[in-house]
């Protein structure tokens, strides 16, 4: 009999976590399949970042189990670029698992072209705009043998127009280099545009109170009926006006 979770990258079973006497996650079950983009939304402080930290292995659950298949990389709100390294050198950090120097250089050039930063490979992070820095960060986590991306509000520090561009950029990159993604955001638009599945978390201690499967293929425009319908459903679940 075939395992019902065959092809799954992440499996959480009855996961609970607390900080001292404060319960943050309660008996949470979740399966994330290979190649799926799962976006989590919920009230501020409900435990979304804690869940990412559990998935990354940075912290361990108080109870329950987490099974992970593949190499995990994390993207945070603030990029993790090394200021003393150039664009090319920062991307090369993600390629250290490739032992062949020729293959490593070929991959580095391909990634620079993929994020449309040709001619910027010798620039330092302080010489780039916020959006350009996040594109370098995306290239770095897509480099080499990464399988799972954990993304904690990666575009929230950017202005609205740049956020829109970065959503399109991420969708384009995932088309060309598919990965399993777990993405945390407070942005309802972002969730509806990027996700295959949206998880709405409850107030703390968080449980999954609603799952929304978005049928239209990525990438999606903001005017896509599936995006608009998903936004309405998310807002309704969060108790916000539509």
Regions found by a protein language model. Give the residues of each.
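Hydrophobic anchor residue at the start of the ABC signature
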Residues: 138
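Conserved ABC ATPase signature
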Residues: 124-128, 132
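Helix-to-loop junction immediately C-terminal to a conserved catalytic motif
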Residues: 56
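A short, proline-enriched helix->beta-strand linker immediately N-terminal to the Walker B motif
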Residues: 143-147
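The feature captures the beta-strand-to-loop junction immediately N-terminal to the Walker
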Residues: 41-43
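ABC-type ATPase nucleotide-binding domains, specifically the catalytic core motifs of the NBD
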Residues: 60-61, 89-105, 114
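Conserved ABC ATPase "signature" region
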Residues: 102-120, 172
